[in-house]
């Protein structure tokens, strides 16, 4: 914003203050207090440069860091470090407990900034147990399948197959069997009668020969 516009606004404010004072809206003390708070003329070169607390950035140490050389800042877990400069993604410069130095960026996390997320370069991640499990091979999968317990009897997985009922022979075939058995019995009876007749005939012939010899 240009300096002329700012100075014009200051002039308008003083004019309004004079009007309020003349109208008995504000007292002389209030008028003097406000008028003294305003600069006579605004100069960009003389503008105050006060750093607000919100612009300060702090980090919290996660791990202990022992200085390796001059200029390093030793850290202990829980130390609050005022961040002065980010030299690189790997190294920060900060101040803690009256000491200023350089420390690893992945040894700290943001603090007092409303964010609890990790730093830009977190330590190596911890692998989950699920990721460490080996993928089973085909042989191991087959072995595990064979070692599975048998299912309970209620599942009827191993039930014996039901015996199919034997079908009765057709009526025609059964009738033929009955006829064959009946004819076989008739032949047997007829043969028995023939045998008896032959025996009777032979006996009668012998008897007649004996009678003829007597007479």
UniProtKB/Swiss-Prot annotation:
PTM annotation, UniProt: Ubiquitinated by RSP5. Ubiquitination reduces the protein abundance and its prion-inducing ability.
Quaternary data: Interacts with LAS17, RSP5 and SUP35.
Annotated region (Disordered), positions in chain: 114-189
Subcellular location: Cytoplasm; Nucleus; Cytoplasm, Cytoskeleton, Actin patch
Motif PY motif: positions: 124-127
UniProt modified residues of type N-acetylserine: 2
Residues annotated with Phosphoserine modification: 52, 55
Note: Present with 2190 molecules/cell in log phase SD medium.
Protein family: Belongs to the LSB1 family.
SMART domains, alphabetized: SH3
Protein name, UniProt field: [PSI+] inducibility protein 3
Annotated ranges, domain SH3: 54-113
GO biological process, one term: negative regulation of Arp2/3 complex-mediated actin nucleation
Key words, A-Z: Acetylation, Cytoplasm, Cytoskeleton, Isopeptide bond, Nucleus, Phosphoprotein, SH3 domain, Ubl conjugation
Gene3D superfamilies: SH3 Domains (2.30.30.40)
Protein's job: Overproduction promotes the de novo induction of the [PSI+] prion form of SUP35. The prion-inducing effect depends on the association with the actin cytoskeleton. Also implicated in prion maintenance during heat stress.
Cross-link (Glycyl lysine isopeptide (Lys-Gly) (interchain with G-Cter in ubiquitin)): 80
InterPro entries xrefs: SH3-like_dom_sf, SH3_domain, STAM
Gene Ontology CC, one term: actin cortical patch
Classification via PROSITE patterns: SH3
Domain notes: The PY motif is recognized directly by the WW domains of RSP5.
Stored Pfam families: SH3_1
Induction description: By heat shock. Can thereby reach physiological protein levels high enough to promote prion-formation.
């Amino acid at each position: 914003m240009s300096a002329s516009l700012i100075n014009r606004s200051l002039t308008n404010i003083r004019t309004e203050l004079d009007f309020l004072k003349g109208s008995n809206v504000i007292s002389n003390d209030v008028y003097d207090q406000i008028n003294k708070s305003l600069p006579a003329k605004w100069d960009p070169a003389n503008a105050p440069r006060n750093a607000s607390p919100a612009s300060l950035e702090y980090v919290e140490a996660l791990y202990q860091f022992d200085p390796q050389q001059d200029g390093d800042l030793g850290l202990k877990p829980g130390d609050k470090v005022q961040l002065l400069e980010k030299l690189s993604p790997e190294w920060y410069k900060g101040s803690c407990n009256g000491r200023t130095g350089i420390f690893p960026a992945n040894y700290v996390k943001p603090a007092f900034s409303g964010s609890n997320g990790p730093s830009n370069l977190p330590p190596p991640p911890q692998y989950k147990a699920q990721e460490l499990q080996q993928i089973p091979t085909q042989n191991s999968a087959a072995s595990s399948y064979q070692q599975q317990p048998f299912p309970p009897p209620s599942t009827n997985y191993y039930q014996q197959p039901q015996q199919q009922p034997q079908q009765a022979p057709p009526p025609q075939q059964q009738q033929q069997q009955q006829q064959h058995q009946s004819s076989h019995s008739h032949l047997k009876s007829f043969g028995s009668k023939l045998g008896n007749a032959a025996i009777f005939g032979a006996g009668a012939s012998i008897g007649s020969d004996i009678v003829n010899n007597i007479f």
